[in-house]
Amino acid sequence: MPRFVDRVVIHTWAGSGGNGCASIHRSKFKPLGGPDGGNGGRGGSVVFVVDPHVHTLLDFHFRPHITAPSGKQGMGNNRDGAAGADLEVKVPDGTVVLDEDGRLLADLVGAGTRFQAAAGGRGGLGNAALASRTRKVPGFALLGEQGESRDLTLELKSVADVGLIGFPSAGKSSLVSVISAAKPKIADYPFTTLVPNLGVVSVGEHAFTVADVPGLIPGASAGRGLGLDFLRHIERCAVLVHVVDCTSVEPGRDPILDIAALEAELAAYTPTLQGDTTLGDFAERPRAVVLNKIDVPDARELAEFVCDNIAAERGWPVFSVSTVTRENLQSLIFGLWQMISAYHAARSEPAPGRSLIRPVPVDDSGFTVEPDGQGGFVVTGTRPERWIHQTNFDNAEAVGYLADRLARLGVEDELLRVGAQPGCTVSIGGMTFDWEPQKPAGHPVAMSGRGTDARLESTDPVGTAERKVARHQRHKHGG
């Protein structure tokens, strides 16, 4: 069973809104008190919340389907339905949210950072909210909207100050184990490290974090080996450290060539977070080189030979260390701390508690009418499609109200303009019907006054004598 998961695809469904209620107020001496149907409750949203106690996406690996509760239906006596509670989903610090096309939606960094992954549907209006001067007693209510449904990709990118990069078996895990309290798996075969390991390094009263990630090989930027699984974990690192094995006897391998090969892979990799100004350009992050395993005599000679060449060619600090004898480890720790401090001092500190969130633009102001190629037309637009989903097509009044709304929006005028003929098929939001125009093009829309009741129109007071006659008639018919 996997213990560390850093990339998952999840399916989120927000709760649907509750339906509105169509009811008439009735009480003693007031049998027709007007509409009093309440509105439906809003559906619950799916919200990601950063929890510092969560360190992996393992839970989503086994439970990728996330559904928020729906809102309740409205009731009579102007009682609104209860809203569905938002479903808060805990994610690790450093989680990146991508849409189906791989576009970055949110970069969640910092405890308590929130992101609404799927919005709950709006509740339908009750007939009390739909009443107007021309529609005094609506005999219908609106249906609740469906909650948003989205397929998202979550990627966990380690939040560390220093990222150790190097070929497999270069000694990265050993280095982390001796400069911090971390205990990664250490062995003498390639790809011993299959998941990132984080260690905290103390520097006097200060501390910084180091990420030990799987080994890198040529072609990693194209996905070879552990490839992209490795590279995304160094995107947030302030300092990148090349860990070079000075004991390697493989043909075509030496410290200078190893560094060049690793830099070629980094140059070919395009970070997801490259637009985040708080991190800076990935290619310009400060680098350092650690020449490891100098406790071996031949390795020490090689390190002394290439040290000045690397510093002169690259301009990076070079540290020759041994994790066995712990030689020069303190110099390495203080050198890395100075590089981290200089990096952060040169950059403006981001506001606390903020995250990179890129909302998807939504245009709900207009609509389009296009022929469907079979003599009919398709109307697309946020508002017309939403109105279709709010309509109960078993209720003639509700259908008439929909026709009024579409006419006010200009859908009917546009259909006439593009040549739609009475009786042709029109599709809106998955609903297809035969279109019949309500008015000539260009004429103002006359509201139909649907839902009126003549008994509510009278404003003349009823006299005592008339009430006595009415009561006598009721008693007479009653027996």
Swiss-Prot record:
<comment type="function">
    <text>An essential GTPase which binds GTP, GDP and possibly (p)ppGpp with moderate affinity, with high nucleotide exchange rates and a fairly low GTP hydrolysis rate. Plays a role in control of the cell cycle, stress response, ribosome biogenesis and in those bacteria that undergo differentiation, in morphogenesis control.</text>
</comment>
<feature type="domain" description="OCT">
    <location>
        <begin position="359"/>
        <end position="437"/>
    </location>
</feature>
<feature type="region of interest" description="Disordered">
    <location>
        <begin position="438"/>
        <end position="479"/>
    </location>
</feature>
<feature type="domain" description="Obg">
    <location>
        <begin position="2"/>
        <end position="159"/>
    </location>
</feature>
<dbReference type="Pfam" id="PF01926">
    <property type="entry name" value="MMR_HSR1"/>
</dbReference>
<dbReference type="GO" id="GO:0005737">
    <property type="term" value="C:cytoplasm"/>
</dbReference>
<feature type="binding site">
    <location>
        <begin position="166"/>
        <end position="173"/>
    </location>
    <ligand>
        <name>GTP</name>
    </ligand>
</feature>
<dbReference type="InterPro" id="IPR006169">
    <property type="entry name" value="GTP1_OBG_dom"/>
</dbReference>
<feature type="domain" description="OBG-type G">
    <location>
        <begin position="160"/>
        <end position="341"/>
    </location>
</feature>
<dbReference type="InterPro" id="IPR014100">
    <property type="entry name" value="GTP-bd_Obg/CgtA"/>
</dbReference>
<feature type="binding site">
    <location>
        <position position="173"/>
    </location>
    <ligand>
        <name>Mg(2+)</name>
    </ligand>
</feature>
<feature type="binding site">
    <location>
        <position position="193"/>
    </location>
    <ligand>
        <name>Mg(2+)</name>
    </ligand>
</feature>
<feature type="binding site">
    <location>
        <begin position="292"/>
        <end position="295"/>
    </location>
    <ligand>
        <name>GTP</name>
    </ligand>
</feature>
<dbReference type="InterPro" id="IPR036346">
    <property type="entry name" value="GTP-bd_prot_GTP1/OBG_C_sf"/>
</dbReference>
<dbReference type="InterPro" id="IPR027417">
    <property type="entry name" value="P-loop_NTPase"/>
</dbReference>
<dbReference type="InterPro" id="IPR015349">
    <property type="entry name" value="OCT_dom"/>
</dbReference>
<dbReference type="Pfam" id="PF09269">
    <property type="entry name" value="DUF1967"/>
</dbReference>
<dbReference type="GO" id="GO:0042254">
    <property type="term" value="P:ribosome biogenesis"/>
</dbReference>
<dbReference type="InterPro" id="IPR031167">
    <property type="entry name" value="G_OBG"/>
</dbReference>
<feature type="binding site">
    <location>
        <begin position="191"/>
        <end position="195"/>
    </location>
    <ligand>
        <name>GTP</name>
    </ligand>
</feature>
<feature type="binding site">
    <location>
        <begin position="212"/>
        <end position="215"/>
    </location>
    <ligand>
        <name>GTP</name>
    </ligand>
</feature>
<dbReference type="GO" id="GO:0000287">
    <property type="term" value="F:magnesium ion binding"/>
</dbReference>
<dbReference type="Pfam" id="PF01018">
    <property type="entry name" value="GTP1_OBG"/>
</dbReference>
<keyword id="KW-0460">Magnesium</keyword>
<protein>
    <recommendedName>
        <fullName>GTPase Obg</fullName>
        <ecNumber>3.6.5.-</ecNumber>
    </recommendedName>
</protein>
<keyword id="KW-0547">Nucleotide-binding</keyword>
<keyword id="KW-0479">Metal-binding</keyword>
<dbReference type="GO" id="GO:0003924">
    <property type="term" value="F:GTPase activity"/>
</dbReference>
<dbReference type="GO" id="GO:0005525">
    <property type="term" value="F:GTP binding"/>
</dbReference>
<feature type="compositionally biased region" description="Basic residues">
    <location>
        <begin position="469"/>
        <end position="479"/>
    </location>
</feature>
<comment type="subunit">
    <text>Monomer.</text>
</comment>
<dbReference type="InterPro" id="IPR006074">
    <property type="entry name" value="GTP1-OBG_CS"/>
</dbReference>
<keyword id="KW-0963">Cytoplasm</keyword>
<dbReference type="InterPro" id="IPR036726">
    <property type="entry name" value="GTP1_OBG_dom_sf"/>
</dbReference>
<keyword id="KW-0342">GTP-binding</keyword>
<dbReference type="InterPro" id="IPR006073">
    <property type="entry name" value="GTP-bd"/>
</dbReference>
<comment type="similarity">
    <text>Belongs to the TRAFAC class OBG-HflX-like GTPase superfamily. OBG GTPase family.</text>
</comment>
<dbReference type="InterPro" id="IPR045086">
    <property type="entry name" value="OBG_GTPase"/>
</dbReference>
<feature type="binding site">
    <location>
        <begin position="322"/>
        <end position="324"/>
    </location>
    <ligand>
        <name>GTP</name>
    </ligand>
</feature>
<keyword id="KW-0378">Hydrolase</keyword>
